[in-house]
């Protein structure tokens, strides 16, 4: 199945303009996700706590190399939290999260 984001197109430019006007802090990136179906709005939210079960399939490419694809099922560990990306998406909102890209564990370097 191939994803169809045609319905999301009208939202891309306004979100991009808002993010550029807002600016970014050091080591920040922004994660934007679109809900399936009708979009009712946009929400800034935090990432939901959860985990993937049965998450990777192993494949072999034409050259004999190994690669993995993500699959499985996401388990939401806080389904009643209304300030998360998963809640926003489940309720028709575009979810936006500010994410830190420096994943270095403090005290290890």
Predicted region positions:
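Electrostatically charged, flexible surface regions
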Residues: 3-109
